[in-house]
Amino acid sequence: MRNSPVSPGPGYAPARGSERARRRGVARWLAYVGGVFAGAWLATQLYYAVQIAMWSVFDPGSSAFMRADAWRLSNAQPATTIRHRWVPYDQIARTLKRAVIASEDADFANNSGYEVDAILQAWEKNRARGRIVSGGSTITQQLARNLFLSGERSYIRKGQELIITWMLETLLDKERIFEIYLNSVEFGRGVYGAQAAAQYYYRIPASRLSAWQSARLAVMLPNPKYFDAHRGSPYLAQRAGVIARRMGAAELPASQ
């Protein structure tokens, strides 16, 4: 008697179909989640771009860094206040403008917001240390970070910083970028902008800063809270002398 062919048994085909359905479900879920993240990312970039475009006409009230610092200070010392007062570009001494460029970004007037060599050097230093310790930041990159981003050090934040830098350089002219920078950068504990710094350290308006005063303020920028607390630092005086000698060669951005 000839045996009948053995069937795969009940449930075999449905099991394969169930596996395919499960994979399709996972793929759809991943596509949905990816779409949500992509949409949120694009919305964030649009928000940044709109804000920057508005600042071609309106002055920023405060920066993300300033607001975060105000929150930290209010928790640590409730009596501490943020010192900040916006002044137009032409009311900031040319000596301070030249000193900041000489100290922070000598090619600011001509670069595109990035210094590739500095970024590569920072990358090598970070790779050697196994963590982010340097960013190779131009004035525009510093402004991008101060206006919108947290103090966190990560490659994701650095990537966002580069995107915002491109937006700033595309939507604003160099003089406007520098004006916003000088009015929002930190000069000490709770001290933001050229006017507040001039009044806090020298009891004068930003328009009357001397070359030596400007050089000292510019040297404070990489570590303002430290130098606020150590104003007699020999390094501060020595470095200010170096910057004072370089100021004459510093090129200011052209007026538009």
UniProtKB/Swiss-Prot annotation:
Pathway(s) the chain acts in: Cell wall biogenesis; peptidoglycan biosynthesis
Keyword annotations from UniProtKB, A to Z: Cell inner membrane, Cell membrane, Cell shape, Cell wall biogenesis/degradation, Glycosyltransferase, Membrane, Peptidoglycan synthesis, Transferase, Transmembrane, Transmembrane helix
Superkingdom classification of source: Bacteria
Transmembrane segments: 26-48
UniProt xrefs under InterPro entries: Glyco_trans_51, Lysozyme-like_dom_sf, PBP_transglycosylase, Pep_trsgly
GO CC aspect terms: peptidoglycan-based cell wall; plasma membrane
Known EC number: 2.4.99.28
Membrane association type: Single-pass membrane protein
GO BP: any one term: regulation of cell shape
Xref: Pfam families: Transgly
Reaction catalysis annotation: [GlcNAc-(1->4)-Mur2Ac(oyl-L-Ala-gamma-D-Glu-L-Lys-D-Ala-D-Ala)](n)-di-trans,octa-cis-undecaprenyl diphosphate + beta-D-GlcNAc-(1->4)-Mur2Ac(oyl-L-Ala-gamma-D-Glu-L-Lys-D-Ala-D-Ala)-di-trans,octa-cis-undecaprenyl diphosphate = [GlcNAc-(1->4)-Mur2Ac(oyl-L-Ala-gamma-D-Glu-L-Lys-D-Ala-D-Ala)](n+1)-di-trans,octa-cis-undecaprenyl diphosphate + di-trans,octa-cis-undecaprenyl diphosphate + H(+)
Subcellular location: Cell inner membrane
GO molecular function annotation: pentosyltransferase activity; peptidoglycan glycosyltransferase activity
NCBIfam families: mono_pep_trsgly
Described function: Peptidoglycan polymerase that catalyzes glycan chain elongation from lipid-linked precursors.
Record HAMAP family: PGT_MtgA
Protein family membership: Belongs to the glycosyltransferase 51 family.
Protein name: Biosynthetic peptidoglycan transglycosylase
Organism of origin: Burkholderia pseudomallei (strain K96243)
